[in-house]
Amino acid sequence: MSQFVVCALYKFVSLPAFEALQQPLLKEMESLEIKGTLLLASEGINGTVAGSQAGIDSLLAWLDAQPGLDNIVYKLSFDDEMPFYRTKVKLKKEIVTMGVEGIDPRKVVGTYVKPKDWNKLISDPEVLLIDTRNDYEVNIGTFKNAVDPKTQTFREFPDYVKQNLDPKQHKKVAMFCTGGIRCEKSTAYLKEQGFDEVYHLEGGVLKYLEEVKPEESLWEGECFVFDNRVSVNHQLEKGQYDQCNACRLPITEEDKQSEHYVQGVSCPHCIDKLSDKQRKRFVERERQVQLAKSRGESHIGSDVKQVIEARRQDKVERKQRQHQEG
C-alpha cells in the first residue's frame, strides 16, 4: 500500500462560529502531521489533505466530534509521495466559489445518483450531461458525450446556464464534478432557475472511479486533481500528466517537447499569455531552483515559496485586469 492517504472532504452545514474553529483545526492537523488545505465558511467545510492512514482516521474522528461536522462526505486515494507542501486552514465567504448570493444546497439541491446507477442515467438520450469543471480539467478526461461549458472558473458557470440552457427545452439535466461539491451548488442553482429534473453524481468522479470497474466505465481519460499528483487514472493512482509551474495547467510529455516549453517558465498553453513581468519572474524563480540543486541543497522549500509568491502576484494582476475590464 502507498505511504500517504489523500482525503478530499466537504460538508454543507451552518457554521455561524466558523472562525473559532480555524486554530483548533490547524493545531489538530499539525499534531497529526497532515498537510493540505481546508476551507471554512459559514456554509461549511471543504478541502483536500494528506497524511498517514492513522493521521487521516484521527482527523476524521476529530471532525466528526465537532458540532455540525459529523458524517462528512469524503473520498480516499493514495500516493507514494506527499502531494502537499504546507498545512493551512483558511476562512472564506464560500467553501466553493460560485459568486451567486442565496444559493444554499442545504435547502434545495439536485437528485443524488449513486455511481452504480450513473451509467444508466447518462445513457438516456433525453438527459443532457454537463461537466461543471474548468476547461483544463475537461481537456484531460470526462464522461462520454458530456457537454463542456468551456469555463475557466466555477464563477462562469451561472452565465453559461443563462446563455445556453432553458428549463422548457432541457427537461433532464445531469451534472458531475471531481468530488461532488461543485455539483451541490450547480444543481441548487439550476433548481433555483426553474429546472425540474436535475441530477448529480454522488461523490463525484473520484467516487465513480473507485466503485465502477474500468471495463464498465463510461469515463474517458484521467481526472484532474488539485494537488501535486496533477491527475489520477481509473485506479486512482497518479496519472501521466505533469504541471507547468508557470500557468499550473496539466502538460503531457509531448508538450514538454514543444519549442514553447521552458521548464518552470512557460508551456504551449501559456506562452502567449504571459506578460514580460511574469516571464522574468518565472525565469528568476527557476534559476534559484537550479542553483540550489547545483549546490546539493534542498530546494523544495525555496521552490515552494517562489511558486506561492508567483501565484499570489498572478492573482493580484488578474484581479486588477478584471477591475479594469469592468
UniProtKB/Swiss-Prot annotation:
UniProt keywords, alphabetically: Oxidoreductase, tRNA processing
E.C. code: 1.14.-.-
Region (Disordered): 293-326
Molecular-function GO terms, alphabetical: oxidoreductase activity, acting on paired donors, with incorporation or reduction of molecular oxygen
Signal peptide span: none
Keyword tRNA processing: yes
Reactions mediated catalytically: uridine(34) in tRNA + AH2 + O2 = 5-hydroxyuridine(34) in tRNA + A + H2O
The keyword tRNA processing is annotated on this UniProt entry: yes
Active site as annotated: C177
GO biological process: tRNA modification
Disulfide bridge positions per record: none
Residue ranges that the Swiss-Prot or TrEMBL entry lists as coiled coil: none
Stretches assigned to the Rhodanese domain: 123-217
PANTHER family xref list: RHODANESE-LIKE DOMAIN-CONTAINING PROTEIN 7-RELATED, THIOSULFATE SULFURTRANSFERASE/RHODANESE-LIKE DOMAIN-CONTAINING PROTEIN 2
Role, per record: Catalyzes oxygen-dependent 5-hydroxyuridine (ho5U) modification at position 34 in tRNAs.
Family named by the database record: Belongs to the TrhO family.
Protein name per Swiss-Prot or TrEMBL: tRNA uridine(34) hydroxylase
Protein species of origin: Shewanella loihica (strain ATCC BAA-1088 / PV-4)
